[in-house]
Swiss-Prot record:
Native source organism of the sequence: Glycine max (Soybean)
EC numbers, comma separated: 1.14.-.-
Cofactor: heme
Cysteine pairs bridged by disulfides in the record: none
Keyword Iron-sulfur: no
Protein name: Cytochrome P450 71D8
UniProt keyword annotations, A-Z: Heme, Iron, Metal-binding, Monooxygenase, Oxidoreductase
Superkingdom to which the source organism belongs: Eukaryota
SUPFAM superfamilies: Cytochrome P450 (SSF48264)
Induction: By fungal elicitor.
Alphabetized GO MF terms: heme binding; iron ion binding; monooxygenase activity; oxidoreductase activity, acting on paired donors, with incorporation or reduction of molecular oxygen
EC top class, as a word: oxidoreductase
InterPro entries named in the record: CYP450_71D, Cyt_P450, Cyt_P450_CS, Cyt_P450_E_grp-I, Cyt_P450_sf
Family the UniProt entry places it in: Belongs to the cytochrome P450 family.
Length: 504
C-alpha cells in the first residue's frame, strides 16, 4: 500500500495538533500560570518573537510592558517563564534559588561540552558542586587571576604596539580585541599560545551562536524528524569534533610534559596553567567525584569561551558607547592622562585610582550584559507571586530588560557612567537591578578573571590613542546592532581610526 506525500504531511500535522492539545489541557487543568500573550497551536508564542523584528531579549521586553514582569510563554513544546524585574529576579536567584538552580538541557551544550559537564551547563548535583568549587578555589580565584597578570601585561603591550604601527588608518578593533583575549586566555589555560588558536577561536564563536536557546531542536525536543530537517545536531557535532581534536592534542602534550618532569627527564618547572591544575587534581585521588579527561576538556572549553568572547564583546561595547558618546570618552581619557601624566608603562596595580573608568565599565555591563537572557529551570514546584511554577518550566531572566528598567534607572537607555559615582552597586549579585554576572548559586565564577581582562586594555586604548570614526562618520550614525547568541556581540565589526597621543 502506497501513501501520498500529502497524506503523510497531514498525518504528521494531526499528530502535532493532538500532541499540543494534550499538553495544553494538562497545563491549564493543573497550574495557575502567570499571564502571557495568546498562543497558536503547536508553535505557541514563537510567532510573537519571530515577527518582532528585534532580538529575543528586546522582543520579550515589549511583551512584558503588557503582561508584567513575570510572564508565561509557550515556546514550541517548552513552557517558559520570562523574568524581567529586579523583584522577580530576586525570587528566582535568591529566595527560591535552589528551586531554580538547574540549567535547561539544550542540544548544543550536550554535544559541545561533553554531555554538559562544564561549569555553565552541568546539571545541579555533586559533580556540579565539585566543579564550581574547583573553579572558585583553584582555577579562577583572585590569587590565580593575579598570577596571570604578567601574561595580560605582555599581551596588552603587543596590542598597543600593533595599533601604534597602524595609526592614522582604520583598524578592525573588534578583531584585535578578540585576538588579544584569545591569546591571553590561551596562555593562561594552556601555558602558551596554541598553534591552532585561530581555528579554536573561530570554533568558539560558532558554538556561542548555537547556544542562544532559540534553536528549533531545543524548542521541539521530542520531534526527532524535525531535527533531521534543521541539521542543527550535525552542525554542532561538526564543530565539536574539530574542537575536540585540538583539545585532545593539548591534553596529550601536557600529559607528556608531566611524565617527563616526573621521570626527571625534563626541566619544565613552569608556572601551572589551568590544564596543569585540572590534571593535578584528577591524579590526586582527592576528588569526591572522579574527573575524566572529557570533563577537563569541557571545563577548559567553557573557560576559553567565556574568557574570550564575553570579555572581547564587553570591550567592543565599551569603545562603541564611548564613540557614540564622545564626552564620556574625553572624560575617561582626561582621568587617565591626568593620573598617569606621560607615564610609559601602566600596570594593573596602577588602575585602582581610575574611578571614572570603573564607572564606564559598570555602565557598559548594565546596557550590554554578557548573557542577556540567563537560563534556569524549575526543579521543585514553586509558588511565586501567587502563581504556581511547575517542575521543568524553563526560566529566562532578562538581564537586558532589568538593566534598563526605568523604575530603577533614570534615562535608562542612555549611556551615563556618572550614575555609578559614589554608588554601592557592585557586580556581586546583591543588587538585583544590576546582575551582569548573574546571582545566586549559578553566578558566573569567572567574574574576577573577566574584569581583569577588561580593565587594563580599555585603559591602555584610551591612554595611548585618540580615536575617530572612519569616513567622517558622526557619532549618532554609528550602528549599535547586536548579534544574538549565548553572548550578545556587535553584529558588525567596529572599525576605528587611532592616532597616537603625545603628552605635551
Amino acid at each position: 500500500m502506497e501513501y501520498s506525500p500529502l497524506s503523510i504531511v497531514i498525518t504528521f500535522f494531526v499528530f502535532l495538533l493532538l500532541h499540543w492539545l494534550v499538553k495544553t489541557y494538562k497545563q491549564k487543568s493543573s497550574h495557575k500560570l502567570p499571564p502571557g500573550p495568546w498562543r497558536l497551536p503547536i508553535i505557541g508564542n514563537l510567532h510573537q518573537l519571530a515577527l518582532a523584528a528585534s532580538l529575543p531579549d528586546q522582543a520579550l521586553q515589549k511583551l512584558v510592558r503588557k503582561y508584567g514582569p513575570l510572564m508565561h510563554l509557550q515556546l514550541g513544546e517548552i513552557s517558559t517563564l520570562v523574568v524581567s524585574s529586579p523583584k522577580m529576579a530576586m525570587e528566582m536567584m535568591k529566595t527560591h534559588d535552589v528551586h531554580f538552580v538547574q540549567r535547561p538541557q539544550l542540544l548544543a551544550p550536550q554535544f559541545m561540552v561533553y554531555g554538559a559537564t562544564d561549569i555553565a551547563f552541568a546539571p545541579y548535583g555533586d559533580y556540579w558542586r565539585q566543579i564550581r568549587k574547583i573553579c572558585t578555589l583553584e582555577l579562577l580565584s583572585a590569587k590565580r587571576v593575579q598570577s596571570f597578570s604578567h601574561i595580560r601585561q605582555d599581551e596588552n603591550k603587543k596590542l598597543i604596539q600593533s595599533i601604534h604601527s597602524s595609526a592614522g588608518s582604520p583598524i578592525d578593533l573588534s578583531g584585535k580585541l578578540f585576538s588579544l583575549l584569545g591569546t591571553t586566555v590561551s596562555r593562561a589555560a594552556f601555558g602558551k599560545e596554541n598553534d591552532d588558536q585561530d581555528e579554536f577561536m573561530s570554533l568558539v564563536r560558532k558554538a556561542i551562536t548555537m547556544t542562544g536557546g532559540f534553536e528549533v531542536d531545543d524548542m521541539f525536543p521530542s520531534l526527532k524528524p524535525l531535527h533531521l530537517l534543521t541539521r542543527q545536531k550535525a552542525k554542532v557535532e561538526h564543530v565539536h569534533q574539530r574542537a575536540d581534536k585540538i583539545l585532545e592534542d593539548i591534553l596529550r602534550k601536557h600529559m607528556e610534559k608531566r611524565t617527563r618532569v616526573k621521570e626527571g627527564n625534563g626541566s619544565e618547572a613552569e608556572q601551572e596553567d589551568l590544564v596543569d591544575v585540572l590534571l593535578r587534581l584528577k591524579e590526586s585521588g582527592s576528588l569526591e567525584v572522579p574527573m575524566t579527561m572529557e570533563n577537563i576538556k569541557a571545563v577548559i572549553w567553557n573557560i576559553f569561551a567565556a574568557g574570550t568572547d564575553t570579555s572581547a564583546s564587553t570591550l567592543e561595547w565599551a569603545m562603541s558607547e564611548m564613540m557614540k558618546n564622545p564626552k564620556v570618552k574625553e572624560k575617561a581619557q582626561a582621568e587617565l592622562r591626568q593620573i598617569f601624566k606621560g607615564k610609559e608603562i601602566i600596570r594593573e596595580t596602577d588602575l585602582e585610582e581610575l574611578s571614572y573608568l570603573k564607572s564606564v565599565i559598570k555602565e557598559t555591563l548594565r546596557l550590554h550584559p554578557p548573557s542577556q537572557l540567563i537560563p534556569r529551570e524549575c526543579i521543585i514546584s514553586t509558588n511565586i507571586d501567587g502563581y504556581e511554577i511547575p517542575i521543568k518550566t524553563k526560566v529566562m531572566i532578562n538581564t537586558w530588560a532589568i538593566g534598563r528598567d526605568p523604575q530603577y534607572w533614570s534615562d535608562a537607555d542612555r549611556f551615563i557612567p556618572e550614575r555609578f559615582n559614589d554608588s554601592s552597586i557592585d557586580f556581586k549579585g546583591n543588587s538585583f537591578e544590576y546582575i551582569p554576572f548573574g546571582a545566586g548559586r549559578r553566578m558566573c565564577p569567572g567574574m574576577t578573571f573577566g574584569l581583569a581582562s577588561i580593565t587594563l586594555p580599555l585603559a591602555l586604548l584610551l591612554y595611548h590613542f585618540n580615536w575617530e570614526l572612519p569616513n567622517k562618520m558622526k557619532p549618532e550614525d554609528l550602528d549599535m546592532d547586536e548579534h544574538f547568541g549565548m553572548t550578545v556581540a556587535r553584529k558588525n565589526k567596529l572599525f576605528l581610526i587611532p592616532t597616537v597621543y603625545e603628552a605635551s
